[in-house]
Amino acid sequence: EFDVTNLARKWYLGDNHGVQLSAPKSESSFSQLHSSETANQPYFVLEYASLAGLESYLTYDHQSAGLAGTGSVSLVNGNLIFAHADTAMNGNRLPVSITHYYNSCDSDKDEFGMGYGWRTSLHQTLHKVLYNGEVEFVYTDGDGTEHFFKKNEDDQKKYSDQSGLSLTLEVGDENITITDKGDNVMTFPLVSDTPTEDAPETAKVLIQKIQDAVG
């Protein structure tokens, strides 16, 4: 496997839009014939992560609309995320806020009966997907960003996120928890279904509870 993230970024502004694979040692001359009619055709697989929402490690062009909210356009894929703050309370221990989000990557979906592309920060979901023959979990946060979790080799009940946010997912007997690096815990119901080749995604379950590090 090769990480071509930086190379792919250069494709946007550069003239070269390809990948060259070369041996570490080369001879002065080399000749080899490959027939176009061979049964084993070469192929190149490019994997990319969903960049559908708002994340601190991505770059956006922000535009305020006053009390209506703020629009953010991703400089990576042109996706529009519009955030409208509904309410916010400091609280004695754990602050609470609710925000409406419109995500143009979800413009064809009305999952929560709020209009196409809309959700609130409380509509956080979890489901399973079948990817390269392995089952992974996908956590969708309040603005629509998808975070993928792969199973740990040393602990079959724990999964680590692939977005670099240091999130840990653990499958328990009664529920599933996601813990961040500050020891805040999100609790979800068990995802009982298993994805298959014919149905590679399971139904989504909604978050049940959020608990801070001190309980």
Regions found by a protein language model. Name each.
Residues 153-164, 209-212:
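A short, surface-exposed interaction/processing loop segment used at functional sites
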Residues 141-142, 179-183, 190, 199, ...:
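Beta-turn initiation residues at beta-strand->coil junctions
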Residues 175, 204-208:
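Short active-site oxyanion
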Residues 6-10, 23-28, 49-51, 103-105, ...:
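Acidic glycine-/aspartate-rich tracts in secreted/extracellular proteins
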Residues 44-136, 142-146, 163-177, 181-184:
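Intrinsically disordered, low-complexity segments enriched in small residues
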Residues 1-51:
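Secreted, disulfide-rich extracellular signaling modules
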Residues 84, 98, 149-151, 169-171, ...:
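Aromatic-rich beta-strand edge motifs centered on tyrosine
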